[in-house]
């Protein structure tokens, strides 16, 4: 008979105020946690494994609640360590099951990132952020309008998975609700390489979230040297934000293309696949914008690019295309392609034997396009703060939050 594991009752999240001299255990993968237990606590490695399970399987952050640890070890942990997760600023479910969290990074409340859970019939995908803002300035991206602040720590990245899994009641050995993680949220993951790779290690560890390599996907705008480094240090699925079939157009949409043009980018993707035979394909993301990159000639050019990629890898279907209807946000000059143009674009690719999917928009009612909720909530927070200052200064009450 299978053991029945009770989902822990949802308790209020602890404050994310770090304590000087204490190690946040969420910042460590298995190897780092083992080293901490041996070198700092003077304990055996298996004790690190016990604590890792308490944190990631049972969502326990208080050492006193880790009941299979002795009092002496718990006292050591209280002295030298802590488990801090991000604070939830805003928790917004959608009518279609999509769920979005706005999470505060740090104790000052000035930085926030977004995490989105997208359920489907056979899987549940979590979209995770890697930076506060982004510095690549892609012209069609809402996050780019907010600028770049800083990289997220490993704890802040894996903390997003912890919060979502805790919310979903994702207890190991029961029905899995969180089946995939995509590093497609705010930021460029490869510009925060070490922290992202460490967090993805926890996602794929059986003591963490036990996801298969192919179920963790890193999406990049095309940092060629980091793609090459990733091929030797991690074994996750790779997605590339392409969005244009030629350099002239891509440079206007993704300025990084001026440094790493399409030919160099495609060559690095081919090297990524050839480095490990278990890697079957790279997904190329293509956001369709009305009158910009959705014309038939763009589709034919993209089909040629995919055929060239197959030849470089020497394997059929090495490149898959994911067509993404543009999700408008306030102030953008771009528009979503019409449905007829999207279908015509896809047909040209399919007729050219290119594996092509159209990503259906989810969570429109909660602004699930990355960067939108942060902009709305943080703007309201700013206006509320200004309103409060006005009242405190006795300047009247004609301001509005």
UniProtKB/Swiss-Prot annotation:
Keyword Kinase (UniProt): no
List of residues binding [4Fe-4S] cluster: 134, 138, 141
Co-factor binding details: Binds 1 [4Fe-4S] cluster. The cluster is coordinated with 3 cysteines and an exchangeable S-adenosyl-L-methionine.
Family membership: Belongs to the radical SAM superfamily. RlmN family.
Protein name: Dual-specificity RNA methyltransferase RlmN
Cofactor entry: [4Fe-4S] cluster
Localisation: Cytoplasm
InterPro entries (alphabetical): Aldolase_TIM, Methyltransferase_A, RlmN_N, RNA_MTrfase_RlmN, rRNA_lsu_MTrfase_RlmN/Cfr, rSAM
Disulfide-bond pairs as recorded: 127-370
Function: Specifically methylates position 2 of adenine 2503 in 23S rRNA and position 2 of adenine 37 in tRNAs. m2A2503 modification seems to play a crucial role in the proofreading step occurring at the peptidyl transferase center and thus would serve to optimize ribosomal fidelity.
UniProt KW Thylakoid keyword: no
Catalysed reactions listed for this entry: adenosine(2503) in 23S rRNA + 2 reduced [2Fe-2S]-[ferredoxin] + 2 S-adenosyl-L-methionine = 2-methyladenosine(2503) in 23S rRNA + 5'-deoxyadenosine + L-methionine + 2 oxidized [2Fe-2S]-[ferredoxin] + S-adenosyl-L-homocysteine; adenosine(37) in tRNA + 2 reduced [2Fe-2S]-[ferredoxin] + 2 S-adenosyl-L-methionine = 2-methyladenosine(37) in tRNA + 5'-deoxyadenosine + L-methionine + 2 oxidized [2Fe-2S]-[ferredoxin] + S-adenosyl-L-homocysteine
Binding positions (S-adenosyl-L-methionine): 187-188, 219, 241-243, 327
Superkingdom assignment: Bacteria
Catalytic residues in the record: 114 (proton acceptor), 370 (s-methylcysteine intermediate)
GO MF annotations in UniProt: 4 iron, 4 sulfur cluster binding; metal ion binding; rRNA (adenine(2503)-C2-)-methyltransferase activity; rRNA binding; tRNA (adenine(37)-C2)-methyltransferase activity; tRNA binding
Sequence ranges assigned to domain Radical SAM core in this UniProt record: 120-365
GO biological process, one term: tRNA methylation
Organism of provenance: Stenotrophomonas maltophilia (strain R551-3)
Keyword terms, alphabetized: 4Fe-4S, Cytoplasm, Disulfide bond, Iron, Iron-sulfur, Metal-binding, Methyltransferase, rRNA processing, S-adenosyl-L-methionine, Transferase, tRNA processing
Pfam families according to UniProt: Radical_SAM (PF04055), RlmN_N (PF21016)
UniProt-listed Enzyme Commission number(s): 2.1.1.192
EC class (word): transferase
Miscellaneous section: Reaction proceeds by a ping-pong mechanism involving intermediate methylation of a conserved cysteine residue.
Gene Ontology annotations for the cellular component aspect, listed alphabetically: cytoplasm
């Amino acid at each position: 008979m299978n053991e029945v594991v009770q989902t822990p009752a949802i308790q209020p999240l602890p404050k994310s105020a770090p304590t000087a001299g204490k190690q946040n255990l969420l910042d460590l993968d298995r190897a780092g946690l083992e080293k901490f237990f041996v070198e700092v606590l003077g304990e055996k490695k298996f004790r690190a494994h016990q604590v890792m399970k308490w944190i990631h399987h049972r969502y326990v952050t208080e050492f006193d609640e880790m009941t299979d640890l002795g009092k002496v070890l718990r006292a050591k942990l209280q002295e030298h360590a802590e488990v801090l997760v991000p604070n939830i600023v805003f928790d917004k479910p959608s009518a279609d099951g999509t769920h979005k969290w706005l999470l505060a990074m740090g104790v000052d409340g000035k930085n926030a990132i977004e995490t989105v859970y997208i359920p489907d019939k056979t899987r549940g995908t979590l979209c995770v952020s890697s930076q506060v803002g982004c510095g690549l300035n892609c012209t069609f991206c809402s996050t780019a309008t907010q600028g770049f602040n800083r990289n997220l720590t490993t704890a802040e990245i894996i903390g997003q998975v912890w919060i979502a899994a805790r919310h979903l009641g994702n207890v190991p050995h029961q029905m899995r609700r969180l089946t995939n993680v995509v590093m497609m949220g705010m930021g460029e993951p490869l510009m925060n390489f070490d922290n992202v790779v460490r967090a993805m290690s926890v996602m794929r560890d059986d003591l963490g979230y036990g996801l298969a390599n192919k179920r963790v996907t890193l999406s990049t705008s095309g940092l060629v040297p980091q793609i090459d480094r990733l091929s030797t240090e991690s074994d996750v699925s790779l997605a590339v934000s392409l969005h244009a079939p030629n350099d002239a157009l891509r440079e206007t949409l993704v300025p990084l293309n001026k440094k790493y043009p399409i030919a160099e980018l495609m060559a690095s993707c081919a090297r990524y696949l050839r480095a490990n035979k278990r890697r079957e394909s790279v997904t190329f993301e293509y956001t369709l914008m009305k009158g910009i990159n959705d014309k038939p000639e763009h589709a034919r050019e993209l089909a040629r690019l995919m055929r060239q990629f197959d030849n470089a890898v020497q394997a059929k279907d090495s490149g898959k295309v994911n067509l993404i209807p543009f999700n408008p946000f306030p102030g953008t000059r771009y528009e979503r392609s019409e449905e007829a143009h999207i279908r015509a674009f896809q047909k040209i690719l399919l007729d050219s034997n290119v594996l092509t999917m159209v990503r259906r928009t989810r969570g429109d009612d909660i602004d699930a396009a990355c960067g939108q909720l942060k902009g709305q909530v943080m703007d309201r927070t700013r206006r509320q703060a200004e309103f409060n200052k006005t009242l405190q200064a006795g300047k009247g009450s004609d301001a509005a939050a």
